[in-house]
């Protein structure tokens, strides 16, 4: 039986691309991981890999084809050169031509959306900072971030946004959509591709009393600006004896994303959280994103604001409040439970909630904590939950060594040891650079199944 090879999504915002050229022809035998074609978008040319071995039995889209929609079948992969009969799933998809077809990347994003919306009644959709009776409306995380910046720019004319493609292109992930039209080019500033340059300008502007919001196309590129972030922004208040503040926000997507390789999938939360003088925020949902970004812009300290591109398009309930600002340094219990505490942040919260729902069917009642702030860490909420459940499992979309998970384990041991009935277990990504090949990438990233396994161990169910 043949399977369809579909036009991949190279980013969560990609809708179509150009199939630049085929690197294989009909009848070629291929192995998993072999490069089949080159796909071009308005930003880059990427390679399309085979996810399985077989024979290219038919090429459906010729090379050079433009505006190929994501999810379009571009070739058949079969067991031999004459195999063009689709398997059941592919045949059904083909028969239902009007139904949208998900690419591998969009399938993962859809899984994240499902994970982030568990059906258990114990999930707390609100936050303790929201008054009872508040009306809610639905908004994507991307829109919540945009509204937070727009509201603060209306409130304070010292606030401005600067970064690559934030103005005319409206952000690499469309987070700054509409800001240029409302506030103009003096306050929404496109920059050259020089993170070191525009971050330094931002730090200087902050020291002179402005409130810059610096967008990195990805936090991986913040490595080019790390001297300004750590040696200038983070240390100025201390080294000036409290005379000079640096109210600046460095924000952008952080952590793993589908098929972007080892250099674009790193989690910098633990890196920046290790630095005295920095505030580090990592929102999970639109409530976190809006309330914390507004707080970050108002903060007199430098803030590193870590977003997740897989959650940008996810829709959440957001409170209808004139000025919704969350406190920095305060975690929230997003699901109540009594048997085990699962602590996470950013996209890890979605996996934790999915795991908690599955564990409930086994009779394990898990409490889930959304950290929201990585520095300063809310030790009080963690330790209070530990005192109730006597077990902690941490979940982190990042490496295990010198991680936020490691810090939580240390806190539990140093300040909550008498309440521990089991060792603290960490569920993280593999301790290796993230592979580009889809099958290897999947094995190396944190997932709900690994969380379930860890919880069973600390509850002595296995």
UniProtKB/Swiss-Prot annotation:
Entry-linked NCBIfam families: PRK09212.1, PRK11892.1
Subunit architecture: Heterodimer of an alpha and a beta chain.
Pfam family, one: Biotin_lipoyl
Assigned EC number: 1.2.4.1
InterPro entries: 2-oxoA_DH_lipoyl-BS, Biotin_lipoyl, PDHB_mito-type, Single_hybrid_motif, THDP-binding, Transketo_C/PFOR_II, Transketolase-like_Pyr-bd, Transketolase_C
Protein name: Pyruvate dehydrogenase E1 component subunit beta
Coiled-coil portions: none
Cofactor note: Binds 1 lipoyl cofactor covalently.
GO molecular function, one term: pyruvate dehydrogenase (acetyl-transferring) activity
Natural source organism: Zymomonas mobilis subsp. mobilis (strain ATCC 31821 / ZM4 / CP4)
One example of a Gene Ontology biological process annotation: pyruvate decarboxylation to acetyl-CoA
Cofactor: (R)-lipoate; thiamine diphosphate
Function: The pyruvate dehydrogenase complex catalyzes the overall conversion of pyruvate to acetyl-CoA and CO(2). It contains multiple copies of three enzymatic components: pyruvate dehydrogenase (E1), dihydrolipoamide acetyltransferase (E2) and lipoamide dehydrogenase (E3).
Binding residues annotated for thiamine diphosphate, in chain numbering: 195
Keywords: Lipoyl, Oxidoreductase, Pyruvate, Thiamine pyrophosphate
């Amino acid at each position: 039986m043949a399977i369809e090879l579909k036009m991949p999504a190279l980013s969560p915002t990609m809708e179509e691309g150009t199939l630049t050229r085929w690197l294989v022809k009909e009848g070629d035998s291929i192995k998993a991981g072999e490069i089949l074609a080159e796909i071009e978008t308005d930003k880059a040319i990427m390679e399309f890999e085979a996810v399985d071995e077989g024979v290219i039995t038919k090429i459906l889209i010729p090379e050079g084809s433009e505006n190929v929609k994501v999810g379009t079948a571009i070739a058949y992969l079969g067991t031999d050169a004459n195999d063009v009969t689709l398997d059941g799933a592919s045949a059904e998809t083909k028969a239902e031509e009007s139904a949208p077809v998900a690419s591998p990347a969009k399938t993962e994003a859809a899984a994240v959306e499902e994970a982030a919306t568990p059906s258990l009644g114990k999930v707390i959709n609100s936050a303790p900072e929201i008054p009872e009776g508040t009306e809610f409306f639905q908004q994507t995380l991307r829109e919540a971030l945009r509204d937070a910046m727009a509201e603060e720019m209306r409130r304070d004319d010292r606030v401005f946004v600067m970064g690559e493609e934030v103005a005319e292109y409206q952000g690499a992930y469309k987070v700054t959509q509409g800001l240029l039209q409302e506030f103009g080019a003096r306050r929404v500033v496109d920059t050259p591709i020089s993170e070191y340059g525009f971050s330094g300008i931002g730090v200087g502007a902050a020291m002179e009393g402005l409130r810059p919001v610096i967008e990195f196309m990805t936090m991986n590129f913040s490595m080019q600006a790390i001297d300004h972030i750590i040696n200038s922004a983070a240390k100025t208040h201390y080294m000036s004896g409290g005379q000079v503040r640096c109210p600046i926000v460095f924000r952008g997507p952080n952590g793993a994303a589908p098929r972007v390789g080892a250099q674009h999938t790193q989690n910098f939360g633990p890196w920046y959280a290790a630095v005295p003088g920095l505030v580090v925020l990592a929102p999970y949902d639109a409530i976190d994103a809006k309330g914390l970004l507004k707080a970050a812009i108002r903060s007199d300290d430098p803030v590193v604001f870590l977003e997740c591109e897989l959650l940008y398009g996810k829709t959440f309930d957001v409170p209808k409040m004139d000025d919704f600002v969350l406190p920095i340094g305060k975690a929230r219990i997003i699901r109540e439970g009594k048997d085990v505490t699962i602590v996470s942040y950013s996209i890890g919260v979605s996996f934790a909630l999915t795991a908690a729902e599955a564990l409930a069917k086994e009779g394990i009642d898990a409490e889930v904590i959304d950290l929201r702030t990585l520095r300063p860490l809310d030790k009080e909420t963690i330790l209070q939950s530990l005192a109730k459940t006597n077990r902690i499992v941490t979940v982190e979309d990042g490496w295990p060594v010198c991680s936020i998970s490691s810090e939580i384990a240390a806190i539990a041991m140093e300040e909550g040891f008498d309440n521990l009935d089991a060792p603290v277990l960490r569920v993280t990504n593999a301790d290796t650079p993230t592979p580009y090949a889809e099958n290897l990438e999947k094995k190396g990233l944190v997932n709900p199944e690994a969380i379930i396994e860890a919880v069973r161990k600390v509850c002595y169910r296995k």
